[in-house]
């Protein structure tokens, strides 16, 4: 299996540090608003990477953080006259509603920056002790000139980075590229005690601390959006490798940009969509399919016309599943004849083609093409006279491969009636009260598989069919 490593700019054989365990960190959202479809592309892509690694037999420790203290969160809190904690908690909840809707699996850990202040302070102390950071007026900065490999991820030297960087002039910094590790408190802003005075962490340090705390000093995969290569990921490498003296991540994965109607997504231009806006109009799996129909490193263009095309494509797959499920109820359970054995072999070949596509840098576009070939072959070769054993085999293989892409075709059937749904919700509430989070999550996942989405609100649990 090969993946493209931003660090080397080449496709490399994937060999995790530990034979059957993959430690993967994905930069999560800054929680001050609903996630937009650009965010969603990254989360869908890396959820799919995780699913395929699990399909291949790896145990994936998947960590995705929440940045829950930030200038944008502070601004939103001031506008709404609430605390930053209230803003963050609201939009973390909204994130999970959208993520569950899109079939994005929960991370092994979803750490929040504000819950790791002590860890962050200890990390900064290491950098100061090693001579990589300096303190000015309660602010702590990382001294980029001290880190000789600065620029290795973006493949630029310090002079090129300085020339291309849009960096505010700051008299406190020794170098314009130096970045803040700890920000001194400003009036009216939340702050925590530190050896340098009251303040809060810088953005870059949060990810270094949370990733290494839960996954170790060297990760297998660190992933995120294209805009994070510089400065965020570059700075993460600098501070992590300066602190620990070993490679921060073996592989770096970045998605391509997402444009809207051939222009960069921008709120001011009005060409901006939240996930919520799109999933209110389309089945969430249509958006998921749309995101995966292009290679993850390719830029993609989003428009409602293209979503209509994705909807038609999704319906073709949905119809194939519905047809196979119907045939299960009418076909006789007999052994395969010679022609059916040949058809079964053809589907074994399809499975191999799908895996080959995914083994080649997670080429979901080619993998989806294989699903369409499978649906076409099934529609033309399987009928009510076919062996039930063959139908079961084809349906099983089709659903397993679709599941790697996060497609469960929830629209095909909802076997649960309202009474059964309410009974399961009650069982989940009981599990939550008893702090049996595993059972509560299993019930939520089971309901989601049946096309039922739960929404925890202050008034209680709401549910809807999708």
Curated annotation (Swiss-Prot):
Gene3D superfamilies xrefs: Cysteine-tRNA ligase, C-terminal anti-codon recognition domain (1.20.120.1910), HUPs (3.40.50.620)
Main location: cytoplasm
EC assignment: 6.1.1.16
GO CC annotation terms, alphabetical: cytosol
Residues at which Zn(2+) binds: 27, 207, 232, 236
Positions of short motif 'KMSKS' region: 264-268
Keyword check for Repeat: no
Residue ranges of the motif 'HIGH' region: 29-39
This protein's record includes keyword Iron: no
Protein location: Cytoplasm
Catalytic activity: tRNA(Cys) + L-cysteine + ATP = L-cysteinyl-tRNA(Cys) + AMP + diphosphate
Keyword tags: Aminoacyl-tRNA synthetase, ATP-binding, Cytoplasm, Ligase, Metal-binding, Nucleotide-binding, Protein biosynthesis, Zinc
Family: Belongs to the class-I aminoacyl-tRNA synthetase family.
Protein name: Cysteine--tRNA ligase
Record lineage: Bacteria, Bacillati, Bacillota, Clostridia, Thermoanaerobacterales
Gene from which this protein is expressed: cysS
């Amino acid at each position: 299996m090969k993946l493209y490593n931003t660090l080397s700019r080449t496709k490399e054989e994937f060999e995790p540090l530990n034979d059957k365990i993959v430690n993967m960190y994905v930069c999560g959202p800054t929680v001050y608003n609903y996630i937009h479809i650009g965010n969603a592309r990254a989360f869908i892509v890396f959820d799919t990477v995780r699913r395929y690694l699990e399909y291949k037999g790896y145990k994936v420790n998947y960590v995705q953080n929440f940045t829950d203290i930030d200038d944008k969160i502070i601004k939103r809190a001031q506008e709404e006259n609430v605390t930053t904690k209230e803003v963050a908690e609201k939009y973390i909840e909204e994130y999970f509603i959208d993520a569950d809707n899109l079939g994005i699996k929960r991370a092994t850990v979803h750490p929040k920056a504000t819950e790791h202040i002590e860890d962050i302070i200890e990390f900064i102390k290491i950098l100061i002790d090693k001579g990589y950071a300096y303190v000015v007026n309660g602010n702590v900065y990382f001294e980029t000139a001290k880190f000789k490999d600065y620029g290795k991820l973006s493949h630029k030297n310090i002079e090129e980075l300085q020339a291309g960087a849009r960096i505010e002039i700051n008299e406190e910094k020794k170098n314009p590229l130096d970045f803040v590790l700890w920000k001194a408190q400003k009036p009216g802003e939340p702050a925590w005690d530190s050896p340098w005075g009251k303040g809060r962490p810088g953005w870059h340090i949060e990810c270094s601390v949370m990733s290494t705390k839960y996954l170790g000093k060297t990760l297998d995969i660190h992933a995120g959006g294209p805009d994070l290569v510089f400065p965020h990921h570059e700075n993460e490498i600098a501070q992590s490798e300066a602190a620990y003296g070993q490679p921060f991540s073996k592989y770096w994965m970045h998605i391509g940009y997402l444009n809207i109607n051939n222009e960069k997504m921008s709120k001011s231009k009005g060409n901006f969509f939240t996930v919520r806006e799109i999933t209110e109009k389309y089945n969430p799996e249509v958006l998921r399919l749309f995101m995966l129909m292009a290679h993850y490193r390719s830029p993609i263009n989003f428009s409602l016309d293209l979503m209509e095309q994705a909807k038609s494509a999704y319906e073709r797959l949905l119809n194939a599943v519905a047809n196979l499920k119907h045939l299960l109820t009418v076909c006789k359970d007999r052994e395969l004849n010679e022609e059916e054995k040949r058809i079964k072999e053809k589907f074994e070949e399809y499975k191999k083609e799908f895996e080959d596509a995914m083994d080649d840098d997670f080429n979901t576009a080619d993998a989806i093409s294989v699903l369409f070939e499978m649906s076409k072959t099934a529609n033309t070769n399987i009928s009510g006279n076919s062996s039930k054993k063959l139908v079961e085999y084809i349906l099983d293989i089709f659903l397993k491969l679709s599941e790697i892409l996060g497609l469960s075709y929830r629209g095909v059937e909802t076997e649960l009636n309202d009474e059964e749904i309410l009974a399961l919700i009650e069982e989940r509430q009981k599990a939550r009260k008893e702090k049996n989070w595993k059972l509560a999550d299993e019930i939520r996942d089971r309901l989601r598989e049946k096309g039922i989405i739960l929404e925890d609100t202050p008034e209680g649990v709401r549910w809807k069919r999708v």
